[in-house]
Amino acid sequence: MMVRPRAWAWLVLLCGMVATVPAVAGAQTPPHSFVAGHGQFLLDGKPFQVISGEMHYARIPRACWRDRLRMAKAMGLNAITTYVFWNWHEPEPGVYDFSGNRDVAEFVREAQREGLYVILRPGPYSCAEWDFGGFPAWLLKDPTMVVRSRDPKFLAAARAWLLRLGKELAPLQIGNGRPIIAVQVENEYGSYGDDHAYMEDIRRMLVDAGFTKAQLYTADGAKQVPRGSLPELPAVINFGPGEAQKSFATLKQLRQDGPMMSGEYWDGWFDHWGAPHTADDADQQAKDLDWMLRQGYSVSIYMFHGGTSFGWMNGANSNGKNYEPDVTSYDYNAPLDESGRPTPKYYRFREIIAKDTGVTPPPVPAVPPTMTAPTMLLAEGISLWKTLPAPTHSEQLLSMEALNQAYGYILYRTQLDGPVTGDLVIDTLHDYAQVYINGKLAGTMDRRLGQHELPLKIAAHHARLDILVENTGRVNFGPALPGEHAGIVGRVRLAGKPLMGWDIYPLPMLTPGDLRYSKQPCDGPCFYRATFTVTTTPKDTFLNTSALTKGEVWLNGRALGRFWNVGPQKTLYVPAPWLKPGRNEVVVFDLKGKSGQKIEGLDHPVLHAAVLRSPAE
């Protein structure tokens, strides 16, 4: 959808971006060079210390990009690092989207307008606590395809993607006078495999895509450099607090000629549902940053600004046994918090960078205050059971991907002959299920807790079995990655007998759709609608989800993200540009909804509430 210039100007003002900057488009810019040489990085032949910070345009409302970039410049950074998430741009094979919040080229141009260079991480694998590590779910439709391998089917899909991305971004390299100084090949492959031929395949794809006028490089943990690097490219290293000196010592042993750079210095961490909010060691981080800068080493702080994994885009961790889905917020304890506000860490890092570089940064921009939205009564609702689409019938169970579905929920329905008593067993559940007998909730199963069995006692001669499954976020890192099909993978058995003959209902819920709400009571899996009025200029706010159980929230048709009463996150960030003066609509889908619930507005986030380990109740 195109937005008129005046509308964009209004959105820009909401994020506090009022200064005028010179346009880049159409300007004649001389070519420059950025290469690794003589043990360091060279910009136009002169030594250059990269002081970068990571933030992802997909996790930030477009109207706020410029505001966040100015905050980066004011902290003393000279570059911005960003992933490009493949699934964000190619939702279906051969269907590409670089519009609106997906306009990565405009994000790069805006960085240049703010005097920042750009380090690009196009993958094709990203990680980043993003669903499936940035891979599109449709790769899993072919059960024989193996991602991150030399499988010809995977390589063909990755090549087509990178060639298309090159059309957007290759013109924006430093060799063309634009801001992209470096492009990463794959991502931390040494923590996954050691196939150097595969890494060469990815490097060749990037070259063929036109990324020849910026410095290619690889990134790994220090000990994994031999497995994930390429001898002809610089290798940068990723590590966390307290590991700087040891990690660089290892890199020096492996790459005596340098250059020395931390591609990810972890200045925080992410949170999992049902686990405590991650503690922060700002003192150690300040010491590490100071030490690296004084050595003359380059660094990219991960994250400078985390933002939000809006909608269904959070990932998960797994070592092949456990499953740990990530929360919606990607605050990360970063210098700039989830809503773009500087934290004490921001000012501490700013002081260190200024001291160690001798460069005084621009003043820190003023940030508009937050607001408290009025309390919203979820007075209108409709049961999920009244909104089901036409099913697909299959004797065998099918995954989401087999039905061309990427996110949301999927319902499996079959008829049972009873009476029967025994365990309902799901071979492989991805990821959370509510089980119903004749429309009545019989129990839940949670992959996070290793649950895949539920005792049932069915007295009726005929009964309807419904298994409502949520894709809680595909694993984004580790050996489980290739098998991250969503839904039920494998068989379902009851009392030892395989169940066959299923009606399967895809429920992607990318938007709530046009539903027929009523004021009749609605309990169980229900959609609810409420409205509230903004009487002043919209400002950032937060929705308190403490009264809700498990599900998703949309604001004016935009998916804000997930909620789950297991904690630790109990608010959802509402960016000011997504609010409208006047009437605003909130839609909630709650797996265990109750009529009459309320959502309170808050002027601050709640990301560290007490956690529950048990399933949602």
Say what each PLM segment does.
Residues 26-79, 109:
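N-terminal carbohydrate-binding accessory modules
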Residues 50-61, 85-103, 140-160, 184-195, ...:
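The substrate-binding groove and active-site-proximal loops of carbohydrate-active enzymes
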Residues 65-131, 203-208:
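Aromatic-lined substrate-binding rim segments of carbohydrate-active enzymes
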Residues 94-102, 113, 123-149, 199-204, ...:
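Aromatic- and acidic-residue-enriched segments that line the glycan-binding/catalytic groove
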Residues 421-436, 465, 532-556, 563-564, ...:
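Aromatic-lined ligand-binding clefts that engage carbohydrates, nucleic acids, or primary amines
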